[in-house]
Amino acid sequence: MKLIGITGMPGSGKSAITKLAEKYKIIVVSMGDVVRHETSKQGLTLNPENVGNTAVKLREIHGNEAIAVPCLNYVNEKYKNEDFVIIEGIRSIYEVNYLGKNAKLDIIAIHSSPKTRFERLSGRNREDDSNDWNTFVERDERELNFSIGNVISLADYMVVNEGNYMDFINNLENTLKKIIKAD
């Protein structure tokens, strides 16, 4: 099995991979779902502060691989016979190292400017998103503290999502095809 990791700052367009994955019959597992599940399990409201604090606490208690370990265990239990599995939402270099030690891994980074991402998040209406600029900046700082900047800069592929949505989807699909073809 080969893992295709998707990384990018909140609102960059990481979830767009889901539609492409359906087209190519590739399973998508979201690392963010692991954190949101743990937040809910603790009886906390899903909002940027609680979800972010849960991610920090999980890493403090269980180490820097705290999200990657249960995510990969889940993939190995449920999807071990798949040729490809997409792991959406990789945040830290420790997660990359852990996943790369335990499976073949390529990373796609999706990049959008802060202004573009804020506009998207303000209109997305997901419980853990915010339409407040200061909360948005705090979330970005928390993500950067996880070392997501290192993951983005060391990614195998970079797709920019700043303009036309269909151009972005075409570029993302071409990148996905390169990875599939190379394997």
Swiss-Prot record:
GO terms, molecular function: ATP binding
Signal sequence interval, chain numbering: none
Gene3D superfamilies linked: P-loop containing nucleotide triphosphate hydrolases
Keywords (A to Z) from UniProt: ATP-binding, Nucleotide-binding
InterPro entries per the UniProt record, alphabetical: NTP_hydrolase-rel (IPR022970), P-loop_NTPase (IPR027417)
Pfam families, per database record: AAA_17
Positions that bind ATP: G8, M9, P10, G11, S12, G13, K14, S15
Homology family: Belongs to the UPF0200 family.
Descriptive protein name: UPF0200 protein MmarC5_0311
Protein species of origin: Methanococcus maripaludis (strain C5 / ATCC BAA-1333)
Lineage: Archaea, Methanobacteriati, Methanobacteriota, Methanomada group, Methanococci
